[in-house]
Regions:
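A residue-level marker of the well-folded mature domains of exported/periplasmic proteins
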Residues: 24-353
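Sec-dependent signal peptide recognition
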Residues: 2-10
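C-terminal motif of bacterial Sec signal peptides marking the signal peptidase cleavage site
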Residues: 15-16
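Signal peptide processing junction and immediate N-terminal pro/mature segment
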Residues: 19-22
Length: 353
C-alpha cells in the first residue's frame, strides 16, 4: 500500500511540470530564467544565448531572468566548492517563479539533472550537455547537444588551405576534455586538406583572462610558428584577436559561435556558426505558444538542421575554396563523410582515407 502511495505521489510530481506550463501559458505570465558561465556580452557563445532569449522577450512579452556565474573562488565564501557555488547561483535564479530555466554550458550537465528532480514544477533546458550514459534525462528536462565536429572539420579544412605555415593552432580554456568534438573535427579537416600539417594544441589556465589569451597567441604565432589559431576559450579567446591584429594581416584567426570577422576584419578567415539562440528560441516558443515541452530526451543538432554552419566569404576564401567547402558540407550532410568527435574516431577516420 505504501509503495503504491509513493508511486502515485511521484507520478503527480512528474506531471506537475506540464500542468504548470499550460497554466502559465494561458495566464500569459511566462517567466524564463537563463544561467551562463560568463558574460552575456562575450561576442560569442553566451551572446548567442542572450540574443535568443531577448528575441523571445521581444516577440512574446515574457519575463526574463538572466544571471552569470560568480567568478570562483567567491570572496567571503571560500569554503564552497565550485559545484556548490554553481548550485547557489542556480537557486538564486529559482527564487523567481520560473516556468522554463535554460542552463548554458556543459558544466551545468550534472546540476541540471539534480535541479530537475528537485523542482518538477520547472522545465529545464541544458545546452551542450555531456554524455549522460546510463543516467536517465528527467521528463521535465531537455538536453541539447551539437555536432560541433562538423563545422570544426570545415574550419580545419579552410585553415589548412589558407595557412602560410606548416602548423595550425588550437587554443582552449582549462576544461579542454569537453572540447574533443571540436578538436578532433578540426584536426580531421586539416588532415583531409593536407596530411603534412601539424596541429599545435594549447590550454589556457582560465576562460576569463583576455591578456593571457593575447600572450599565448603571440607565442603560438611567433614561437610555435602557427599560421592560424582556432580559439575556444571564452573571454581569454578574445585576446587572440588582439594579438593577430597587432602582428598583422597574415596572422589568421577562426571565429566561433557568431561571425566574428568584425572583431579583426583582416585576420578572421572564417567563423564556426553555432546558433544556440535559434535552438533556445525554437524550444521556448513552442512551449509559450502551445504549452508543449518535449522533455526526457537528448537531441542533437548540426549541419543538416541548419544550426551549425561555417562562414564562406568569397572575398576572403576565393570562389574555388568556397565551392570545395560547399561540396564537403553536402558530403557531411549526406553521410558520405563521417566526421570524428574523439581521438579513436579520428584514428579510424585517418585509416580510411
Amino acid at each position: 500500500m505504501f509503495k503504491r502511495f509513493v508511486f502515485i505521489v511521484l507520478s503527480l510530481l512528474v506531471l506537475a511540470c506540464f500542468k504548470s506550463n499550460k497554466k502559465s501559458v494561458k495566464s500569459d505570465k511566462v517567466v524564463i530564467g537563463v544561467l551562463a558561465n560568463g558574460s552575456f556580452y562575450d561576442k560569442g557563445y553566451n551572446q548567442s544565448v542572450y540574443d535568443g532569449v531577448v528575441k523571445l522577450k521581444d516577440d512574446f512579452g515574457i519575463k526574463l531572468i538572466t544571471k552569470s556565474l560568480r567568478p570562483y573562488p567567491i570572496e567571503g565564501e571560500r569554503l564552497l566548492t565550485a559545484n556548490e557555488a554553481m548550485a547557489e547561483d542556480a537557486y538564486d535564479v529559482q527564487k523567481n517563479p520560473l516556468n522554463l530555466f535554460w542552463l548554458a554550458g556543459h558544466q551545468f550537465s550534472s546540476l541540471s539533472v539534480k535541479l530537475s528532480y528537485e523542482r518538477p514544477d520547472i522545465c529545464y533546458g541544458i545546452i551542450d550537455a555531456f554524455d549522460y550514459g546510463d543516467i536517465r534525462v528527467p521528463k521535465n528536462s531537455l538536453a541539447i547537444k551539437f555536432r560541433n565536429e562538423e563545422a570544426a572539420f570545415l574550419a580545419g579544412y579552410i585553415a589548412a588551405k589558407m595557412s602560410r605555415k606548416e602548423k595550425i593552432g588550437f587554443l582552449t580554456g582549462p576544461e579542454s576534455e569537453y572540447l574533443n568534438d571540436f578538436k578532433f573535427g578540426f584536426k580531421a579537416g586539416i588532415f583531409y586538406a593536407n596530411p603534412k600539417l601539424r596541429l599545435v594544441s594549447k590550454k589556457a589556465p582560465s576562460r576569463f583572462d583576455k591578456e593571457k589569451g593575447k600572450e599565448m597567441a603571440r607565442f603560438m604565432y611567433k614561437e610555435d610558428k602557427v599560421g592560424v589559431i582556432f580559439p575556444i576559450a571564452g573571454i581569454t579567446g578574445l585576446g587572440v584577436y588582439d594579438a593577430a591584429k597587432e602582428l598583422g594581416p597574415k596572422y589568421y584567426v577562426i571565429g566561433l559561435n557568431q561571425d566574428q570577422s568584425y572583431i579583426a576584419p583582416q585576420n578572421v578567415i572564417t567563423s564556426v556558426l553555432k546558433d544556440i539562440g535559434k535552438v533556445i528560441y525554437s524550444v521556448s516558443s513552442d512551449y509559450i505558444k502551445n504549452g508543449v515541452f518535449k522533455g526526457g530526451v537528448v537531441i542533437d543538432r548540426g549541419l543538416k538542421e541548419g544550426v551549425i554552419e561555417i562562414v564562406k566569404d568569397p572575398d576572403v576564401l576565393n570562389n574555388r575554396l568556397v565551392n570545395e567547402v560547399v561540396e564537403l558540407e553536402n558530403k557531411i550532410i549526406s553521410g558520405e563523410i563521417i566526421v570524428p568527435d574523439s581521438e579513436y574516431a579520428f584514428d579510424l577516420f585517418k585509416s580510411k582515407l
